[in-house]
Each structure stands twice: as structure tokens, then as C-alpha cells.
């Protein structure tokens, strides 16, 4: 029974390696279009200089202020 379990585990690891699991869930999303434009949030009309974040339209302006 244990050898069957070992074979099954080996097959599963070969078909779905642990490196395929993304472990960077706490990282912010990569926005290449903003990086390519040399985006500076300080020049955005939604940027709040006091809080150092964007108050509106978080799709365009980063970092977004918490509510």
C-alpha cells in the first residue's frame, strides 16, 4: 500500500511541481504599462501629498490610500 502511495505522490509531483504554486500572494501586482511610461504618482491629480498616496482611481494611481 505504501509503495502505491509513493508512486502516486511521485507522479503527482512530476505532473504538478511545487514551483508551479505561486507563493508571492502578498506582493503587489506588476503593472508593466505604468512602469513603461515612467509613471510618477506625484504628478497625478489624485495624489494626496500629505498622505503620500492616491485618494481616488486606484486603477491608475499607485499607491492607493486605504479607506
Swiss-Prot record:
A single GO cellular-component term on record: extracellular region
Subcellular location: Secreted
Tissue: Expressed by the venom duct.
Ribonucleoprotein in keyword set: no
Positions of the pro-segment in this chain: 23-50
Keywords of the record: Cleavage on pair of basic residues, Disulfide bond, Hydroxylation, Neurotoxin, Secreted, Signal, Toxin
Residues modified as 4-hydroxyproline: 63
GO molecular function, one term: ion channel inhibitor activity
Main location, first listed in the record: secreted
Family in the record: Belongs to the conotoxin M superfamily.
Entry domain remark: The cysteine framework is III (CC-C-C-CC). Classified in the M-2 branch, since 2 residues stand between the fourth and the fifth cysteine residues.
Record's protein name: Conotoxin TsMMSK-B022
Organism this protein belongs to: Conus tessulatus (Tessellate cone)
Amino acid at each position: 500500500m505504501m509503495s502505491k502511495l509513493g508512486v502516486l505522490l511521485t507522479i503527482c509531483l512530476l505532473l504538478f511541481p511545487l514551483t508551479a504554486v505561486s507563493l508571492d500572494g502578498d506582493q503587489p501586482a506588476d503593472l508593466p504599462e505604468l512602469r513603461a511610461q515612467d509613471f510618477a504618482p506625484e504628478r497625478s491629480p489624485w495624489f494626496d501629498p500629505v498622505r503620500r498616496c492616491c485618494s481616488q482611481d486606484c486603477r491608475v494611481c499607485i499607491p492607493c490610500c486605504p479607506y
